[in-house]
Amino acid sequence: MTNIRKAHPLAKIINNSLIDLPAPSNISTWWNFGSLLAACLALQILTGLFLAMHYTSDTTTAFSSVAHICRDVNYGWLIRYMHANGASMFFICLYMHVGRGLYYGSYTLTETWNIGIILLFTIMATAFMGYVLPWGQMSFWGATVITNLLSAIPYIGTNLVEWIWGGFSVDKATLTRFFAFHFILPFVASALVMVHLLFLHETGSNNPSGISSNSDKIPFHPYYTIKDILGTLLLILILMLLVMFSPDLLGDPDNYIPANPLSTPPHIKPEWYFLFAYAILRSIPNKLGGVLALLLSILILVIIPLLHTSKQRGMMFRPISQCLFWLLVADLLTLTWIGGQPVEHPFITIGQLASILYFTILLVLMPIAGIIENNILKW
């Protein structure tokens, strides 16, 4: 008799994706982040669902409803802080996952990579809209500043902004629609995750060596299921340490002040995971130029496969490219720091230099390094 997991139409899909899936025998912990991201998404949908049961998307009651969740709802504080810090963990895992893809040349699986970029945009949009919902000062002004950037689009800009706002300023209509989108987008992301996996399973996973692993595959279960469970437990441990001991460590104190359109906070800044892009936006004195640079800072990932000049897939045996990769990581950390600083000397100059370096590494230096390394191999 055939095993039910191999015969049943639904069980067969799960079996071929999570149990009998042939996986490379040498994938490292850097390959854990996919499952960690799935765990984060599940956690965010679950905690978000319970928050939505008590939240009201009205400008007069939104702030109070969040306070009510924290004070009066059973374990409401826990659900709220798990959701807020879960987003931070989500982005840490996201950036690690993308970084792994860049380092080991996983972007050569172009369909998987491109769906991943769409996923990244979806989750960034979700996080941005989620930050607006508590209706604190930073929520309101963050929404105002970021949506206002669309007014830089020639001809249709102003109409577009007012259409998104649902009026002439960020108000009740904006909050209501942001809540609606914030609720629906994670489900869109879940569907995209399925497509992401579909494309990945067409080709199979990459591995640290960058060479084909078809001659040496092992079943996903039990080897990688147990490895993923370990990773998930560590993720939950770090998240719960954050939630229990310093839930507001990564937040902004200004968001505990109710939104006031008449009082601008001294430093308007997004959540920490958007600071690098915000720094790139601010480093260009022109509004439209800044918006384009902001978009390109993420969209540049689309052309990474086209800029691959090396004969080797990953960077495991390419020291020059390795140096450039870690320089890029340092540069992104610098941009993140700059994004949180006021717009004054010397931060403006540092931000501009870091922004130029970011694009130079990806567009110029890495392709050149690939060519140099190809030539070194001939000697």
UniProtKB/Swiss-Prot annotation:
Tagged with keyword Heme: yes
Biological processes, Gene Ontology terms: mitochondrial electron transport, ubiquinol to cytochrome c
Residues bound to a ubiquinone: H201
Bound cofactor: record note: Binds 2 heme b groups non-covalently.
Keyword DNA damage: no
Membrane topology: Multi-pass membrane protein
Pfam families associated with the record: Cytochrom_B_C (PF00032), Cytochrome_B (PF00033)
Entry's transmembrane regions: 33-53, 77-98, 113-133, 178-198, 226-246, 288-308, 320-340, 347-367
Binding locations of heme b b566: H97, H196
Positions annotated to bind heme b b562: H83, H182
Keyword annotations: Electron transport, Heme, Iron, Membrane, Metal-binding, Mitochondrion, Mitochondrion inner membrane, Respiratory chain, Transmembrane, Transmembrane helix, Transport, Ubiquinone
Record text on subunit structure and interactions: The cytochrome bc1 complex contains 11 subunits: 3 respiratory subunits (MT-CYB, CYC1 and UQCRFS1), 2 core proteins (UQCRC1 and UQCRC2) and 6 low-molecular weight proteins (UQCRH/QCR6, UQCRB/QCR7, UQCRQ/QCR8, UQCR10/QCR9, UQCR11/QCR10 and a cleavage product of UQCRFS1). This cytochrome bc1 complex then forms a dimer.
Note: Heme 1 (or BL or b562) is low-potential and absorbs at about 562 nm, and heme 2 (or BH or b566) is high-potential and absorbs at about 566 nm.
Stated family: Belongs to the cytochrome b family.
Protein's recorded name: Cytochrome b
Native species: Eumetopias jubatus
